[in-house]
Protein backbone atom coordinates (compact mmCIF):
# COMPACT_ATOMS: atom_id res chain seq x y z
CA UNK A 1 0.00 0.00 0.00
CA UNK A 2 0.98 3.67 -0.38
CA UNK A 3 1.13 5.88 2.71
CA UNK A 4 1.78 9.63 2.78
CA UNK A 5 3.48 11.21 5.78
CA UNK A 6 3.09 15.00 5.66
CA UNK A 7 4.88 17.17 8.21
CA UNK A 8 6.09 20.70 8.90
CA UNK A 9 9.87 20.51 9.23
CA UNK A 10 12.77 18.20 8.42
CA UNK A 11 13.24 15.92 11.49
CA UNK A 12 9.53 15.70 12.44
CA UNK A 13 9.33 12.52 10.34
CA UNK A 14 12.02 10.88 12.45
CA UNK A 15 11.29 12.23 15.92
CA UNK A 16 7.57 11.46 15.97
CA UNK A 17 7.03 8.51 13.63
CA UNK A 18 10.43 7.26 12.42
CA UNK A 19 10.23 3.81 13.97
CA UNK A 20 6.76 3.14 12.63
CA UNK A 21 7.73 4.48 9.21
CA UNK A 22 10.71 2.13 9.10
CA UNK A 23 8.49 -0.79 10.15
CA UNK A 24 5.90 0.01 7.47
CA UNK A 25 8.57 0.19 4.78
CA UNK A 26 10.19 -3.04 5.93
CA UNK A 27 6.84 -4.84 5.69
CA UNK A 28 6.24 -3.73 2.11
CA UNK A 29 4.42 -0.39 2.28
CA UNK A 30 5.55 2.43 0.02
CA UNK A 31 5.96 5.35 2.42
CA UNK A 32 6.03 8.79 0.80
CA UNK A 33 7.23 11.90 2.60
CA UNK A 34 6.07 15.47 1.99
CA UNK A 35 7.56 18.30 4.05
CA UNK A 36 5.89 21.71 4.08
CA UNK A 37 9.13 23.67 4.62
CA UNK A 38 12.85 23.15 4.35
CA UNK A 39 13.42 24.13 7.99
CA UNK A 40 15.00 27.45 7.10
CA UNK A 41 14.21 28.94 10.51
CA UNK A 42 15.96 26.28 12.59
CA UNK A 43 19.39 26.01 14.17
CA UNK A 44 22.61 25.62 12.19
CA UNK A 45 24.24 23.17 14.60
CA UNK A 46 26.88 23.22 17.36
CA UNK A 47 29.45 23.80 15.99
CA UNK A 48 27.73 25.36 12.96
CA UNK A 49 27.28 22.98 10.04
CA UNK A 50 26.50 25.81 7.62
CA UNK A 51 25.73 29.50 7.36
CA UNK A 52 22.19 30.61 8.14
CA UNK A 53 21.41 31.39 4.50
CA UNK A 54 22.41 27.84 3.54
CA UNK A 55 20.24 26.13 6.14
CA UNK A 56 17.24 25.34 3.95
CA UNK A 57 19.40 23.59 1.37
CA UNK A 58 21.38 21.73 4.02
CA UNK A 59 18.30 20.56 5.90
CA UNK A 60 16.74 19.40 2.64
CA UNK A 61 19.74 17.13 2.14
CA UNK A 62 19.53 15.98 5.75
CA UNK A 63 15.90 15.04 5.23
CA UNK A 64 16.74 13.13 2.06
CA UNK A 65 19.33 11.20 4.08
CA UNK A 66 16.76 10.41 6.79
CA UNK A 67 14.09 9.31 4.32
CA UNK A 68 16.62 6.99 2.68
CA UNK A 69 17.56 5.55 6.09
CA UNK A 70 13.88 4.93 6.88
CA UNK A 71 13.34 3.15 3.58
CA UNK A 72 11.09 5.84 2.12
CA UNK A 73 9.72 5.60 -1.42
CA UNK A 74 9.74 9.33 -2.25
CA UNK A 75 10.32 12.80 -0.85
CA UNK A 76 8.85 16.14 -1.88
CA UNK A 77 8.52 19.64 -0.47
CA UNK A 78 5.52 21.97 -0.57
CA UNK A 79 7.72 25.06 -0.82
CA UNK A 80 6.64 27.01 2.25
CA UNK A 81 9.27 28.99 4.17
CA UNK A 82 9.97 28.18 7.81
CA UNK A 83 10.24 31.47 9.77
CA UNK A 84 12.84 32.03 12.50
CA UNK A 85 11.81 31.44 16.10
CA UNK A 86 10.37 34.38 18.01
CA UNK A 87 12.18 36.45 20.64
CA UNK A 88 11.42 33.85 23.31
CA UNK A 89 12.74 30.97 21.20
CA UNK A 90 9.32 29.61 20.31
CA UNK A 91 8.53 28.21 16.89
CA UNK A 92 6.15 30.04 14.57
CA UNK A 93 3.77 28.96 11.85
CA UNK A 94 4.86 29.46 8.27
CA UNK A 95 2.81 31.81 6.09
CA UNK A 96 0.15 29.86 4.22
CA UNK A 97 -3.43 30.15 3.11
CA UNK A 98 -5.12 27.22 4.89
CA UNK A 99 -7.25 26.26 1.89
CA UNK A 100 -4.29 26.36 -0.48
CA UNK A 101 -2.17 24.35 1.93
CA UNK A 102 -4.90 21.71 2.12
CA UNK A 103 -5.12 21.70 -1.67
CA UNK A 104 -1.36 21.13 -1.95
CA UNK A 105 -1.55 18.24 0.51
CA UNK A 106 -4.47 16.71 -1.38
CA UNK A 107 -2.50 16.96 -4.63
CA UNK A 108 0.47 15.25 -3.00
CA UNK A 109 -1.77 12.45 -1.74
CA UNK A 110 -3.28 12.02 -5.18
CA UNK A 111 0.13 12.02 -6.88
CA UNK A 112 1.38 9.08 -4.82
CA UNK A 113 -2.03 7.36 -4.79
CA UNK A 114 -2.00 7.33 -1.00
CA UNK A 115 -4.40 4.97 0.72
CA UNK A 116 -3.77 6.63 4.08
CA UNK A 117 -2.13 9.78 5.40
CA UNK A 118 -0.20 10.42 8.62
CA UNK A 119 0.43 13.90 10.02
CA UNK A 120 0.68 16.08 13.12
CA UNK A 121 -1.82 15.85 15.95
CA UNK A 122 -4.51 18.27 17.03
CA UNK A 123 -2.37 19.88 19.74
CA UNK A 124 0.67 20.31 17.52
CA UNK A 125 2.50 17.85 19.82
CA UNK A 126 4.07 20.47 22.11
CA UNK A 127 1.93 23.31 20.78
CA UNK A 128 4.06 24.24 17.78
CA UNK A 129 1.93 26.56 15.60
CA UNK A 130 3.31 25.08 12.36
CA UNK A 131 2.40 21.57 13.50
CA UNK A 132 -1.14 22.71 14.33
CA UNK A 133 -1.44 24.43 10.95
CA UNK A 134 -0.38 21.22 9.19
CA UNK A 135 -2.86 19.18 11.21
CA UNK A 136 -5.77 21.38 10.21
CA UNK A 137 -4.74 21.39 6.56
CA UNK A 138 -4.24 17.62 6.47
CA UNK A 139 -7.65 17.14 8.07
CA UNK A 140 -9.23 19.41 5.46
CA UNK A 141 -7.45 17.52 2.68
CA UNK A 142 -8.60 14.17 4.04
CA UNK A 143 -12.19 15.31 4.47
CA UNK A 144 -12.21 16.76 0.97
CA UNK A 145 -10.83 13.66 -0.73
CA UNK A 146 -13.07 11.85 -3.24
CA UNK A 147 -15.80 10.26 -1.19
CA UNK A 148 -14.00 11.59 1.92
CA UNK A 149 -12.39 8.17 2.08
CA UNK A 150 -8.69 9.00 2.64
CA UNK A 151 -8.01 8.03 6.26
CA UNK A 152 -5.94 10.50 8.28
CA UNK A 153 -3.91 9.27 11.23
CA UNK A 154 -2.02 11.56 13.60
CA UNK A 155 1.14 10.71 15.46
CA UNK A 156 2.10 11.14 19.12
CA UNK A 157 -1.42 10.11 20.10
CA UNK A 158 -2.18 10.00 23.80
CA UNK A 159 -2.20 6.88 25.97
CA UNK A 160 -1.54 6.36 29.69
CA UNK A 161 2.09 5.26 29.32
CA UNK A 162 3.13 7.81 26.69
CA UNK A 163 6.82 8.49 27.48
CA UNK A 164 6.44 12.22 26.69
CA UNK A 165 2.87 12.61 27.86
CA UNK A 166 3.44 15.93 29.62
CA UNK A 167 5.55 17.35 26.79
CA UNK A 168 4.56 16.17 23.33
CA UNK A 169 1.49 13.94 23.48
CA UNK A 170 -1.59 15.21 21.67
CA UNK A 171 -3.86 14.90 24.67
CA UNK A 172 -7.10 15.17 22.68
CA UNK A 173 -6.07 12.36 20.31
CA UNK A 174 -6.57 8.97 22.02
CA UNK A 175 -4.30 6.30 20.58
CA UNK A 176 -5.85 3.70 18.30
CA UNK A 177 -2.50 1.98 17.78
CA UNK A 178 0.56 1.90 20.04
CA UNK A 179 3.64 0.51 18.35
CA UNK A 180 6.70 -0.90 20.10
CA UNK A 181 9.46 0.25 17.75
CA UNK A 182 12.44 -0.96 19.79
CA UNK A 183 13.52 -3.40 17.03
CA UNK A 184 13.64 -0.45 14.60
CA UNK A 185 15.51 1.94 16.89
CA UNK A 186 18.85 1.48 15.06
CA UNK A 187 17.13 2.69 11.87
CA UNK A 188 15.42 5.56 13.69
CA UNK A 189 18.74 6.58 15.27
CA UNK A 190 20.48 6.48 11.88
CA UNK A 191 17.78 8.77 10.50
CA UNK A 192 18.18 11.12 13.47
CA UNK A 193 21.94 11.31 12.88
CA UNK A 194 21.17 12.54 9.36
CA UNK A 195 19.81 15.75 10.92
CA UNK A 196 23.25 17.03 11.91
CA UNK A 197 22.15 20.65 12.22
CA UNK A 198 19.52 19.69 14.81
CA UNK A 199 21.36 17.08 16.90
CA UNK A 200 22.58 19.59 19.47
CA UNK A 201 19.05 20.96 19.84
CA UNK A 202 17.61 17.48 20.42
CA UNK A 203 20.18 16.70 23.10
CA UNK A 204 20.02 20.14 24.74
CA UNK A 205 16.25 20.07 25.16
CA UNK A 206 16.17 16.54 26.55
CA UNK A 207 19.12 17.15 28.86
CA UNK A 208 17.57 20.31 30.26
CA UNK A 209 14.37 18.45 31.11
CA UNK A 210 16.24 15.46 32.57
CA UNK A 211 18.73 17.53 34.55
CA UNK A 212 21.68 15.63 33.10
CA UNK A 213 23.27 14.94 29.73
CA UNK A 214 21.08 12.66 27.60
CA UNK A 215 22.63 10.91 24.56
CA UNK A 216 20.76 11.16 21.27
CA UNK A 217 19.79 7.48 21.38
CA UNK A 218 17.89 8.13 24.63
CA UNK A 219 16.19 11.24 23.27
CA UNK A 220 14.24 9.19 20.75
CA UNK A 221 11.02 7.45 21.80
CA UNK A 222 10.95 3.68 21.39
CA UNK A 223 7.16 3.59 21.47
CA UNK A 224 5.05 5.50 18.96
CA UNK A 225 1.30 5.92 18.61
CA UNK A 226 -1.38 6.74 16.06
CA UNK A 227 -4.88 8.17 16.32
CA UNK A 228 -7.36 8.02 13.46
CA UNK A 229 -8.53 11.61 13.07
CA UNK A 230 -10.66 11.02 9.96
CA UNK A 231 -13.04 9.39 9.49
CA UNK A 232 -13.80 9.67 13.18
CA UNK A 233 -14.61 6.37 14.80
CA UNK A 234 -15.53 4.84 18.09
CA UNK A 235 -13.78 1.58 18.76
CA UNK A 236 -11.72 -0.36 16.26
CA UNK A 237 -10.66 1.56 13.09
CA UNK A 238 -11.28 -0.28 9.83
CA UNK A 239 -9.31 0.97 6.83
CA UNK A 240 -6.33 0.02 4.66
CA UNK A 241 -3.68 1.24 7.11
CA UNK A 242 -5.39 -0.38 10.09
CA UNK A 243 -5.54 -3.67 8.21
CA UNK A 244 -1.89 -3.37 7.18
CA UNK A 245 -0.78 -2.73 10.75
CA UNK A 246 -2.77 -5.67 12.11
CA UNK A 247 -1.88 -8.13 9.35
CA UNK A 248 1.73 -7.19 8.57
CA UNK A 249 2.97 -5.56 11.79
CA UNK A 250 0.95 -7.35 14.44
CA UNK A 251 3.86 -8.39 16.64
CA UNK A 252 4.83 -4.73 17.15
CA UNK A 253 1.36 -3.66 18.26
CA UNK A 254 0.53 -3.53 21.93
CA UNK A 255 -2.65 -5.39 22.76
CA UNK A 256 -3.82 -2.39 24.75
CA UNK A 257 -2.44 1.16 24.83
CA UNK A 258 -2.76 1.01 28.61
CA UNK A 259 -0.48 -2.03 28.61
CA UNK A 260 2.66 -0.06 27.87
CA UNK A 261 4.99 0.37 30.82
CA UNK A 262 6.48 3.88 30.75
CA UNK A 263 9.75 2.45 32.00
CA UNK A 264 10.15 0.50 28.77
CA UNK A 265 10.52 3.61 26.59
What is the meaning of each model-derived region?
Residues 1-4, 89-265:
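Metal-dependent de-N-acetylase/amidase catalytic core
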Residues 1-112, 140-144, 244, 252, ...:
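Active-site rim/loop-helix segments in enzyme catalytic domains that contact anionic ligands
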